[in-house]
Design a protein with these regions (language model features):
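Non-catalytic, solvent-exposed segments at the cell envelope interface
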Residues: 2-378
Length: 378
């Protein structure tokens, strides 16, 4: 069974960035121009990030700029990282975090001690020319070797073997997550984007909901999700429940949840195109305000100008040029609730991305996969 979704041709604390200058249901088919503006391969932050390209200056600029939080990944990690490949491509680590701080506590995120884990992880590779992108989802239950990390309080954590992938974030925050991904892939992450549960939910509500079609019922009492087969417009609460459910459909695995997440990301991007946020100033501002409050970025993207420039560079990516796959894994013989990376097949993916090449189909063939493929579509 293929793990690929249906292909389509010390650490510093996050800081609030003040004003600064830039350094360095069935729907009508969206017009091509709108689709180009909408299709960013930035997972949870995608809809919010792209609307920043339309923000103005004055009060709006200062307000949105003041919302942003950033982490200086370069300073935190220093030397010893993979070499940056100057071939026109970009690699972005996108995390959905489940901290229980603030509003997220009501949404069931993180642990009771207030710590956080990366509930969702996607490596986004934007090819040279910014006309195509590949997204590789990393299962949170993957057992990996985590490098030594230093947390935000300056405490050192030794390297660990056979730990869950998502523990890197809870151990040392954003920089430890980046360091772990770079150790796993041998690819330098050019940027980092993180969005929390509360921000994701409000983003969907500000957008007016996201239409999806389910081919069979999805019921999960744990996440209070109950969808009949058919077409639904999901508000933020139900959208969040959908992308988090493990027990509502299929085998209850993280791999099935990833399939649902990937399908929802595509539906979300299509909805951004459909509603035409650029023609509605109030909706544009509301989305931008929500997005800038919800995201944490690397310091290079820590201003509205920088984030808008970054988003603007992705406007040429069409839906037929966005490919989403899952990192090749196999079930752990010692624990069926955990997976192990298929190193040889995964290396084909990492090598392809390092060389700015398409991911070969052989890399995701005959690997472990969930049972939710095709259950949800936009």
């Amino acid at each position: 069974v293929s793990a690929e979704s249906t292909p389509e041709p010390g650490i510093t604390e996050p800081v609030t960035t003040g004003p600064q200058h830039r350094g360095g249901g069935r729907r009508r088919k969206a017009a091509p121009g709108k689709r180009r503006k909408a299709l960013l391969a930035t997972a949870w932050a995608a809809a919010g990030v792209i609307v920043l390209a339309g923000t103005g200056f004055g009060y709006v600029y200062f307000k949105l700029n003041g919302n942003l939080k950033s982490v200086d990944i370069n300073q935190a990690l220093g030397d010893g990282r993979p070499t940056k490949v100057d071939n026109g491509s970009e690699n972005i680590l996108v995390l959905g975090s489940d901290t229980r701080a603030g509003t997220n506590r009501k949404l069931g995120g993180g642990t009771d001690d207030g710590s956080a884990r990366s509930d969702t992880a996607m490596i986004v590779h934007v090819y040279k020319g910014h006309k195509r992108a590949s997204v590789v989802s990393v299962p949170r239950d993957t057992l990996i070797d985590r490098p030594a990390c230093t947390d935000a309080k300056g405490a050192s954590h030794p390297a660990a073997t056979g730990v869950m992938f998502n523990s890197a974030y809870s151990t040392g925050g954003a920089a430890c997550a980046v360091k772990t991904v770079e150790s796993l892939t041998g690819i330098r992450m050019d940027h980092y984007l993180e969005v929390d549960f509360a921000g994701f939910q409000k983003l969907i509500d500000d957008l007016g909901g996201v239409p999806v079609t389910t081919t069979r019922p999805i019921s999960d009492p744990q996440s209070h999700l109950n969808l009949k087969a058919g077409t639904h417009t999901l508000d933020g609460e139900r959208a969040l429940a959908l992308v988090r459910t493990r027990h509502g459909v299929g085998d209850g695995s993280d791999l099935g949840r990833i399939q649902l997440q990937q399908a929802f990301v595509k539906a979300l991007l299509d909805q951004v195109a459909h509603v035409g946020v650029f023609s509605d100033p109030k909706r544009l501002y509301d989305l931008a305000d929500t997005a800038t409050k919800a995201v944490t970025t690397d310091s290079d993207l820590g201003s509205v100008n920088a984030l808008a420039d970054f988003a603007g560079g992705l406007k040429g990516i069409g839906s037929s040029h966005l490919r989403m796959v899952t990192m090749p894994v196999r079930y752990d013989p010692a624990d069926p609730n955990r997976v192990l990376m298929e190193k040889a097949k995964a290396e084909r993916i990492w090598q392809a991305l390092r060389n700015d090449r398409p991911i070969p189909a052989s890399a995701t063939k005959d690997t472990a996969a969930g049972e939710a493929a095709g259950v949800v579509s936009g």
